[in-house]
Regions:
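Internal nucleotide-binding/catalytic subdomain
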Residues: 24-126
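A conserved helix-loop-beta module that forms one wall/lid of the active-site cleft
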Residues: 1-25, 31
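A short linear hydrophobic-aromatic micro-motif
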Residues: 10-13, 42-45, 117-118, 165-167, ...
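A short, glycine/Asx- and small/polar-enriched loop/turn
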Residues: 7-8, 124-130, 217-219
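Active-site "cap" helix and flanking loop/linker of ATP-utilizing ligase/carboxylase catalytic domains
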Residues: 98-119, 125, 135-187
């Protein structure tokens, strides 16, 4: 396809199956970038200029009730392609929020599922909203809802599949979530360092997943910071990211 001119550099390569947490996604800039790609069915997408990545969670009951959560903003680690921070609510205009949430509802209804579905989107430099991926399950982008929303995504999922009235999707307060992942060059029995330095900070809510072993970039937990000042919450999240170390026992 490249030799025929049907695909040009740069582009995004995605494995058709078994992609998660940044795995199975690569930015390809030249022929050298093709050398280490997996030999599998794949999707190739044009690399576009974007200014933000967004997510909207939608809940659907069998009886037809549908509710969306307010749109959130996702910030990704440039090296691992993993979500690093979630900002709730997204720092975009009200017009764009309405547009994103309406689009997510339309997409969710077309899947005809019962449960919850996260619709991930790109916000382009021209303020276009494009669908990136969908995930029909509880999603990392809404883990903050445990503390930050009237109804967590996990409770909402149970309400939806049991065909119970859906809970309020309104946010309780501004939140920033930071993912905790395994350090580079660390593989083995996990050890968490410096938690004592952050658990006393007001508004900090840690969640450890109980995984026995760590490896580079493996999601081991997350921390949600609740604060009326979302910029302050983001600064605290960055401090936590620099302080907490997830490594292996010596």
């Amino acid at each position: 396809l490249i030799s025929k001119g049907e695909i040009s550099y740069p582009f995004i390569w995605k494995a058709s199956k078994m992609g998660y947490d940044g795995y199975g996604v690569n930015k390809i800039f030249d022929n050298k970038g093709l050398e280490n790609l997996s030999d599998c069915h794949c999707i190739v997408e044009e690399l576009i200029s974007i200014k933000k990545e967004l997510s909207v969670m939608v809940a659907l009951r069998e009886s037809g009730e549908i509710l969306n959560y307010p749109v959130v903003e996702m910030e990704f680690n440039k090296d691992s392609n993993q979500v690093e921070y979630i900002l709730s609510p997204a720092q975009i205009s009200q017009e764009l929020k309405i547009k994103a949430e309406k689009l997510a509802n339309n997409i969710a209804e077309k899947f005809k599922i019962c449960g919850i579905i996260a619709v991930e989107m790109f916000l382009t430099n021209e303020d276009e909203i494009l669908i990136n991926e969908v995930a029909p399950r509880p999603h990392n982008s809404y883990h903050f809802s445990i503390e930050g929303s009237y109804t967590s995504q996990f409770e909402q999922f149970l309400r939806a599949i049991l065909d119970l009235p859906l809970g309020s999707t309104k946010i309780l307060q501004n939140s920033v979530m930071v993912n905790l992942v395994g350090e580079e060059n660390s593989k083995g029995i996990v050890e968490y360092k410096n938690f004592d330095q952050i658990i006393g900070i007001e508004g900090v809510n840690p969640h450890i997943y109980g995984k026995f072993e760590t490896r580079p970039n493996r999601k081991m937990g997350h921390i949600t910071i609740i604060n009326e000042d979302i910029d302050l919450a983001k600064r605290i999240a960055k401090e936590i990211k620099e302080t907490v170390i997830i490594t292996t026992k010596k």
